[in-house]
Amino acid sequence: MAAGASLKRIKEASPTPETNHELGFIKKVVFKLHDTYANSTRTIEEPPFEVTETGWGEFEISIRIFFPTEMGEKNILLYHHLKLHPYKKDNIPAQIGAPGGAPNANEDEENTNVPQPVDSYVYDELVFNEPSEQMFELLTSRPGALLPAKSDPNDPSKSYSLQTEAEELDRLTAGLETVYQQVQKTKEYILQLEKEKETLSQ
């Protein structure tokens, strides 16, 4: 998903002949956009199953994937939360922003005047727990998708890599450690209050 300054677009990454071939087992995809769009339900019946639209904001898109009848596979419904706007600096917590928690006003004003693209990528994965025999043969007849070692900022299709996976794990680990430290401090504070309560009750 990508957004520009004057034109906001809802669009999947650019397809290739290889990806078109890999999506050939899909019969059609039905996108349900926000009700404010004319013809908010869009049915796409050929690869690369894209929807391109203009707009600005944040909303949920329902995506229903249909397979050919001979595949014997039920259709799949998934939801994609579209975020197509930048997060302003005043929404950033003080400890993450400029020193003292006050963002630089001149810098904020300067950034407002410079058009900046908004890139929003979300990784979705379909899991077939009990696929039909035809679907199983199709899925196992081709190699799985392997993540590249590093991300390429100029190629949206390579936004996910072993590098970004490791970075995300590091962020999760750091977040868990922060939560653990806060829980410990809270426990110590509660224990201190209980001791003070006992002292006052004597």
From Swiss-Prot:
Its main location: cytoplasm. GO terms for molecular function: histone binding. Residues 94-113 are annotated as: Disordered. It comes from the Eukaryota. Pfam families: YEATS. Belongs to the YAF9 family. This is Protein AF-9 homolog. The gene is YAF9.
